Amino acid sequence: MVLGTYKEIVSARSTDREIQKLAQDGGIVTGLLAYALDEGIIEGAVVAGPGKEFWKPEPMVAMTSDELKAAAGTKYTFSPNVLMLKKAVRQYGIEKLGTVAIPCQTMGIRKAQTYPFGVRFVADKIKLLVGIYCMENFPYTSLQTFICEKLGLNMELVEKMDIGKGKFWVYTQDDVYTLPLKETHGYEQAGCKICKDYVAELADVSTGSVGSPDGWSTVITRTDSGDSILKQAVEAGIFETKPIEEVKPGLGLLEKLSAQKKEKAEKNIAARKEMGLPTPY
């Protein structure tokens, strides 16, 4: 299955106007973690918060809805959230922890839960793992190349970034700039080339924009707990949803991109094996 094991797939968006303004797409990550926090399902969440440099995120422990909102929006460079999990449990004393992760981080967290040596009494505290779709991730220096060198902008002027329709989008207060995705090839993290997971197949809930209209997100529930929390949030009016079959561009595009990432990774893994280089699979 190109999308992994799942319970249900819907198109959804937050009903909170403030979250809608802050979020990348439908506000699912922020809204779901905030709901779980308010309901006592979790006591805090590890998220990618703002860093000392513009658009260079740093992992943070969010204990309130306002802190979650401060971390809203996608950052296209790496935030080492997994490193913050131990601190969240041992220094903040969190017994029920939520976190957001890209697919490779999701895999690492599940491995820690399966083989908890070195993170004993930490992995079992994770009660909600929200995964976000990811085709590739860029080093911060690559973002600087795209924005500062190729587009001629200062990082501090950027209000939002996005990837879609074959382009890398950069939004400022006054204008919108685009860069063909082909010009970003070769700048991604090296590990992205051998990663097979586009849709965070091991998360409790996976989400991203692909497959849904602008302002909405495609949400995949994968575990009993993830499915239950999302349904509770919908019943509480936190999200509005539509059947994925009734929206455009629809599930076909998500399946296509997921399959493409798997195929590309398989080819790169085979090439590495031929050269005698290590592979993760």
Swiss-Prot record:
Name a GO molecular-function annotation: oxidoreductase activity, acting on CH or CH2 groups, with an iron-sulfur protein as acceptor
UniProt entry tagged with the keyword Iron-sulfur: yes
Known catalysed reaction(s)?
Answer: oxidized coenzyme F420-(gamma-L-Glu)(n) + H2 + H(+) = reduced coenzyme F420-(gamma-L-Glu)(n)
Q: How is the cofactor bound?
A: There are 12-13 Fe atoms per alpha/beta/gamma unit of the FRH.
Q: What is the superkingdom listed in this entry's lineage?
A: Archaea
Cofactor(s) required for function per UniProt: Ni(2+); iron-sulfur cluster; FAD
Q: Which UniProt keywords apply?
A: Iron, Iron-sulfur, Metal-binding, Oxidoreductase
UniProt xrefs under PANTHER family: 7-HYDROXYMETHYL CHLOROPHYLL A REDUCTASE, CHLOROPLASTIC, FORMATE DEHYDROGENASE SUBUNIT BETA
Summarize the subunit comment.
Heterocomplex of the form (alpha(1)beta(1)gamma(1))(8).
**What is the protein named?**
Coenzyme F420 hydrogenase subunit beta
Organism equals Methanothermobacter thermautotrophicus (strain ATCC 29096 / DSM 1053 / JCM 10044 / NBRC 100330 / Delta H) (Methanobacterium thermoautotrophicum)
Name of the gene: frhB
